[in-house]
């Protein structure tokens, strides 16, 4: 038996015809989606209580979820902007190495709404499809078990799901998901084209007018989604009524050409296709390249426009030179294409086929199409029909199951819109319905129940001017099996349902379905009268609580309303959302029904659960006559909803001028503010309704009223200006009426500063003419000039300079306007400022010059302009870095080239010792490394710690880059200050492939460090058996001894690596070798309890322990127990650098007690500082803010995405880039690699913890360990008594040294606990210990050196965009690779801290200390921490 949710699942909704199609660009969208998913994960981790699944009143909660993440993401864009293509790529990635390859694994379920297939718009099918996919996904174990409840299964039955979709969605999807254990990573539910099938006017209120749609279901329940599930929807930006339903969603626009990265997408799409398609490239010459530049401009961000034109070029249907003649809109393109496709009267011949396709409620097969068209022309043969399909071949595509559909739904809409398609190409869907109705008539006796419903639908929509009874006779006389047509699903269309009932469809009176059919079929008075006469209750309610009267009022059936009122229907029964018949009729604008209900005494001031009255609903929807009727009846004009918004506020927002005047004339309070302090004037100014603003001012509106953010009407008008919508005239009017032009909001921002930031040059002019202060600074020290420069608004910059703006202003971080403009990237702004005399060598607080900014951001033209003006290419910042190093680090090839040409020192090192070659290599910028080698860069240059680049690449396991260095002459034996080579560190970490490469380049396998430790000993210590075998095979000395006399066998026996011991013994290791202190492998194995190793050693002839228990012989030296805080240094956390590619090499973290300053190592080496440095080019700490609930968002952005060009054209113009494709294909091009590192190591000084260690030979008990104030341990207070006990113990028992090897490095003198001891000769006994500084020593160290601040959760933005190039990649990584320990944790006892940071053992192991020494940090953490605009 199949599950009920699998019986009726629409396959069309779970697939995309674009699957497998090549996808280009849009990387920035995937980055944003990954970031949103990560936010969900973070919120899920911090969530305490799941949301309560209680239905709200219908209006969605505004804002975002209480845990800080948005409810979901809404992809918006015009027709053809690539929404469905993006969703398809997200689910079925076409590129194996793309970011979306990882994102598609987080898809829990998906649904594609398609207007061409009504089944995909069915809410019941949507719910069943989700359930089936979640069960199949395997991502949530146990979900299917929660569906075994018979009550849940009954809700999923066909028909039941359609009758009560809200209940089915809650019981079958939401409640089971809320009851599941959160998955390891957040998941998403994708619904594409959620607005399809929602054909409503913009003014209607969404909560009822969209009832029964997928959009309404999601909008009413998205706040109840589990915190780990992200709802991802797409919709057209024109579908305002739908997009408003998803308040609190993060909206991502795909065709907002104000965003540079969207323009870049369009350009890259063209370039990618040129690069991939020879058939397209052969049409390209330098003369026709300009045509493609025109194409990218004409497309206005519409990828469908680009695709149709470029496909036409490939098919030789369109010539490139004809692009100049193609209209610049999608509708214009359709008209142009039809004029090309259909000559003379060809369109009339194929028009019937298009009519049928437009009328069909699902995709039709070729046979079905032929049968329908044949009913109009019975002489049509199948061959003739096929020829007509061939004429339409460029407009039709293959659907599922050998069906034919139009290539895009926007073209279907165009064919029915006479305004755009003209009379010549106008199609008639009603004619298509007639042909389909006749086709069904011919086969009426053999129709299935669903086909019978389709038959009824086509009859209803045929415009045959027949009454319903006559259409019912049509179906009956043709023998249509109507009786069982309602046995499975109930049609959504009420007229279809009524026709089927009249034609004899059977309704089971015992089934609860009856109430649903009664509600939906009662469109006509005679039907209601019949039912009431047969005993039906006049006040019966459906599952949503709506009465017959409420449904009739909602649909505007005046006759039915009169009948029900005459039969005594209750006028005040509320439905589940608190709506009465009057509020429903007012919301829909049914004036006659409203008058009828008012005349019958309905309560005109009734409020629903959201506080909406009939008056506010009508005012919002723009229903003038309804508003007049209610006002005439004496309604309270200032009733407000839950947000204190009145009818006047709603009408002002909606732009309904006549309603605003009517309300004002009836005494509406003009200055009444909502909960956010916004009046009707602010709402009208924000929306750009000048006439309404004028009416409100004429009636006494306070022009300088502030909202909760301190913004006035002028502030929001300057903020939201699109000049085409009349906002500039609103600004002018407000200034004329006395608006304060220099009014500051809570952030200290004036309208001028906001307008400058947004780039509204007309408004800037108006404000300056009105007396605005051109040099006003906000709370963060930003002037309008700074704001305009940060966003690259050249026209605004010129205007401000014309009005005398001061050019020498400096922000809170010491940056001039030129510095900020250089970071932003608009060369016109930079040249303008240079012409004004700004210092091209000005240093900000971090020592960065404008050239540093431009080089870091990769602005080639700006680098050229600055250098031409005299900028010094070798100027160092506070960290000793020149612009050349920054450009190399970020992978900006063209900038590196320019700086080299202008005498930048190729081997210049920063104070951390890293040069351009080092940072480029670690970031993986192969092309830049090649360029540096070609200019003579020193391949063996060492950093401040004496480590060569090859050493660091080996440490990071960057195999490819290390091999490239070796090919270019890197010294394979180059060592660090401790004598360790690249082979040492690779063996320590177990990087087998790296070891093989180093040996292949003749690395000495027996090379020893300063302590005479070999690579074999390092590998043995870590237990890397394969590395040990490899080294022995290549001649490693098995019994090589270090300074202490220990061999690899002794070390492996101590660490318990039995497989390594086995290999060493097999290759002749001496099992009886003893070190300087007489410790053999057998002895240390016995001490550590490694019984299997003891047996193995005995098998190979090791001397036994003669039956003696190891306890008295091998116990630790008896010393006084000391507090753990004096033995263990502060908490250390290691996270892999993003540059590391080694798998499975993450070593145990150095665990300890954060009693002193905490520190962290993000990487074994110095990871590049790209993330920290990227913040240098931002403006100030706070970005432009707006209220939490409105759409008064001000943050614009430019180029947030790291779009990887198809070729490196070094900032050529787009036309020049296109022309490059006309060159021979053998021409080599360099590609630009996006920076990937997001981590950075903490600095280490000569006093770093890795320099001094103290290893206790007694393992203290955690239970007796406590921390005292000031970071002192109990050991300090009890030193006298402890020392006495120790003396007694030592005198009564012989001293036996424990087998512990010395520290890997001994750089400095060893100090006693609590004091800074001068250097002195250590006794031999002490040299056998790893020394660790006490808590008192640690406290004395510089807090800045060790204390790591965790990156704040707030997203850092630069000029309105993310400054971290990989903010989207920070899934489970620590941001910037650093972790801070809360001060409260530092103050707790050590036992609590260790419980918070679980450790496999209670003390610091020698292996971990050794690991710390090898993977030591670098002194590069004192970089400037920037704050953005």
From Swiss-Prot:
Sequence intervals crossing the membrane: none
The ANK repeat ranges on this chain: 477-509, 511-540, 544-573, 577-606, 610-639, 643-672, 676-705, 709-743, 747-776, 780-809, 813-842, 846-875, 879-908, 912-941, 945-974, 978-1007, 1011-1040, 1044-1073, 1077-1107
Biased composition (Low complexity): 1177-1200, 1267-1293
Source superkingdom: Eukaryota
Record PTM Phosphoserine, positions in chain: 1165, 1167, 1222, 1400
Places the protein is found: Endosome
GO cellular component entries: endosome
Region feature Disordered, mapped onto this chain: 1108-1200, 1217-1296
InterPro entries reported for this sequence: Ankyrin_rpt (IPR002110), Ankyrin_rpt-contain_sf (IPR036770), NPHP3-like_N (IPR056884)
Keywords: ANK repeat, Endosome, Phosphoprotein, Protein transport, Repeat, Transport
Polar residues bias: start-end ranges: 1120-1139, 1160-1170, 1238-1265
Any Gene Ontology biological process: endocytic recycling
Main location: other
Pfam family, one: NPHP3_N
Quaternary structure (record): Interacts with VPS35.
Role according to the record: Involved in the endosome-to-plasma membrane trafficking and recycling of SNX27-retromer-dependent cargo proteins, such as GLUT1.
PANTHER family reported for this sequence: ANKYRIN REPEAT CONTAINING, ANKYRIN REPEAT DOMAIN-CONTAINING PROTEIN 16
Name of the protein in its database record: Ankyrin repeat domain-containing protein 50
Annotated organism of origin: Homo sapiens (Human)
Native organism taxonomy: Eukaryota, Metazoa, Chordata, Craniata, Vertebrata
Gene assigned in the entry: ANKRD50
